[in-house]
Amino acid sequence: MDLTNLRQHHEELVNHMKNSGYSTSCIYMYKRQIREILDLDLESWTSYQDIYQYFVSISSNQKDLKWRRSVIGSIEYFDIYGLFPDRRRICSFIEPRGAYHSLNHVYQQLIDYYKTYAERIGKTKDTTIDSESHSGSVFFYHLQQRGCCNLESTEEDDVLSYFLDESGNLIRSAACCKSVRAVLKAGLEVDPIGCKKVLLFLPHLTEHRKNIQMLTDDEICKINQLLDTDTLSLRDKAIINLLLHTGIRGVDIINLKLQSIDWNSDVIRLIQSKTKKELELPLLPSVGNALYDYITIERPKCSFDAVFISAVVPYEPLKVQTIRWIVRKVFGLANIRMNKGDRIGTHLFRHHLTVKLLEKDTALPVISNILGHTSPKSVDPYLHTDFHHLKECALSIESYPVRKGVFDID
């Protein structure tokens, strides 16, 4: 393994960390790890993965190995690509990950074509394309492991073994099957015979949707009480106010620009990441005040035009993971959603706003516009939690005989 580049330029990495405000202890860990790598320089090393595995072999301290993995990964990115570390992102090793990289050329070609096909037919959400590509890759890898080098050589047992265990119990979800089907349908244009054959073998699974969890009035009260204290930073208060009063997606919060806020017209304008459609939201007083306080008092001075910036150097726009972390922190401080299985995420605020609008008899197209949906049918899942109107649909059973002690009828 050639460590010449690292040996000649590692001081640039150290100087960058000093100039970016990294702590002395953090810089020391990097310098220590670089020194150990350069001093050892074992002939058996062919990659940074080998370097890490060497330290795994001589240490059983999991805490020590955890920081070594992060540091060695960052050193690799610097050595190979000249990229400096970002302390808000844990670097892993530069190595092919996922089933796709283990597929033969035939299956890789199908996945590649699906991605092109998905964009062509107007699938705009990258996460959907990535998710379906991943499901298809894992499915193809399973077939490949069973000796099926292409779809034409695949039999029904090969396909069903992916979805069912040896006892015939279902081990894959309907959503997984739907994703695999999407990849195969796209592949009809590349391998019509093989894809059509495997499509016929796919099981017909019914997708069962669970009722959407929602924030209770008591939980909302606790969140509002927390917002009235000085426990949260102005940035976090502004983010929670946006989630609570606009139902905006977390990914759209991080993409908000300073110019997105029209203070004169009291509106927020943005292009949604999911639908690529323009959305205009009213700038409510509580939201506007929280944003103004953050921007004028706490927001770091930097060259970025994103509204929300990291609180520590190196300053940069927030990532969506940070929004999720803020929500988790707020729920913890408010002492809500602490039980196992409780849903925690930004979508809870979106659900809450939708249900409240439904309770006020707001028309579905209006709700869809507020939430930025492309179709009014997107609101349908929320109707299952509109208990206010569902109660009106309940039929009285007072005319039917009920055994005493089952329940009381007032």
Model regions: which residues?
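N-terminal core-binding DNA-recognition domain of tyrosine recombinases/integrases
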Residues: 10-101, 112-128, 133-211, 226
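Basic, Lys/Arg- and aromatic-enriched nucleic-acid-binding interface segment
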Residues: 222-250
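Conserved tyrosine-mediated DNA breakage-rejoining catalytic core shared by Y-recombinases
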Residues: 246, 255-289
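Short, polar N-cap/turn motifs at the start of nucleic acid-interacting alpha helices
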Residues: 260-263, 319, 332, 342, ...
